[in-house]
Amino acid sequence: MAKATKEEKIILITNDDGITSPGIKNLVEAVKGLGKIIVVAPDKPQSGMGHAITIGSPLRMNKVDLFNGIEAWQTSGTPVDCVKLAVDKILHRKPDICLSGINHGANHSINVIYSGTMSAAMEASIEGIPSIGFSLLDYRYEADMEPSRKIVHIIVSKIMAQKKIDKHLLLNVNIPSIPYKEIKGIKICKQAYAKYDEAFDERVDPQGKKYFWLTGEFKNFDKGRDTDVWALQHNSVSVVPVQFDLTNYTLKKHLEKTISFK
């Protein structure tokens, strides 16, 4: 299993688009030279899996040679399974940082809830591993990843250069799909309040059986200039600090005054 020298920093890389996706290959290229890279990713696309884990069926993993000599493992599980397996079965110590992506498609605003990319990063954060999820606003398999590679390198190198990194650091980074020279900067944001106006399109398959296909339109209700959606619409990279503590502290204080009793 993977081992690094005591001085060597370990970079765990995963994703939800699968181990053969262009996104993860570009993520690996972006951080070469920053530490010992270990790739653990799903053997097939797992988009939209959220924080799902595999229960009641076996998990399998095997070593693959897909990254020019960099140690890599593919698993039959979800993105979160990949992180769990990496920490428990592959690495001899916790990685110094976990990077997830580069996702093909946006994970801003409400997307973070459904995202396998961000759930993998969140799982690592729960384990006390600083983590970053990267997404490009381009769903195409042939998307131009060169600008993303540059942004990834800038952000990761700055984070890893810090003397002490918060072990629960969790960042959701989204990158506009434009040439690098057109990117106006990196903006620290809050998550926009947005959702999908969803509908299930009813269809019939060749056997005459009814099935449903999820469709929908993205709607942003938050027009503030401090949101990830606004930053991306104005050609900036959005960086949202995220946390796995879902407690609503404002409501908690209110409820303590209204319904709490001893």
For each feature predicted by the language model, list its residue ranges.
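Short, glycine-/small-residue-rich phosphate/pyrophosphate-handling segment
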Residues: I132-K158
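Short beta-strand segments
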Residues: T14, V40-P42, S100-N103, F134-S135, ...
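C-terminal accessory domains and tails appended to enzymatic cores
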Residues: A4-K6, Q162-D166, L170, P176-K262
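Short, glycine-rich nucleotide/cofactor-binding loops
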Residues: I13-T20, N111-V112
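A cross-family phosphate/adenosyl-ligand binding-site feature
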Residues: A2-I11, P22-K89, R93-K94
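Short, Asp-centered acidic motifs that coordinate Mg2+ and/or phosphate
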Residues: I97
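Alpha-helix C-terminal capping segments
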Residues: A86-H92, S119-P130
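Glycine/threonine-rich flexible loop motifs
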Residues: A106-S115
